[in-house]
Amino acid sequence: MRNKYIESFEKAQLENRNIPEFRAGDTVKVAVRIKEGSKERVQNYEGLCIAIRGQGTGRTFMVRKMGANSVGVERIFPLYSDSIESIEVLRKGRVRRAKLFYLRELKGKAARIKELRRK
């Protein structure tokens, strides 16, 4: 049984955010607010969502992108973080798993995900 005050706080947090619906296998672009000293800027992080975990305000998602020299870079974002300015879904992927950790071992064209076709 959860505390009613925590539930009401989480409900208020969830209502204020405009987050698109996405799943593992989708290519997303996350605009993250970064503070460096007294300056603040927005940095885009584009990659494949390979996992979504948790529930409520503690929900997180993992994005994997290929960096320089074909090195995979993974980053975990809290879904309802204040540092996330926006999330944009670029492509819907067709996958049959909720966690795509097997992509870590695949290289090049083998690591591609087919696009979901709408009928």
Curated annotation (Swiss-Prot):
Pfam families: Ribosomal_L19. Keywords: Ribonucleoprotein, Ribosomal protein. InterPro entries: Ribosomal_bL19, Ribosomal_bL19_CS, Ribosomal_bL19_sf, Translation_prot_SH3-like_sf. Gene3D superfamilies: 2.30.30.790. GO terms for biological process: translation. SUPFAM superfamilies: Translation proteins SH3-like domain. One of its GO terms (cellular component) is cytosolic large ribosomal subunit. One of its GO terms (molecular function) is structural constituent of ribosome. The keyword Ribosomal protein applies. Belongs to the bacterial ribosomal protein bL19 family. This protein is located at the 30S-50S ribosomal subunit interface and may play a role in the structure and function of the aminoacyl-tRNA binding site. This is Large ribosomal subunit protein bL19. The gene is rplS.
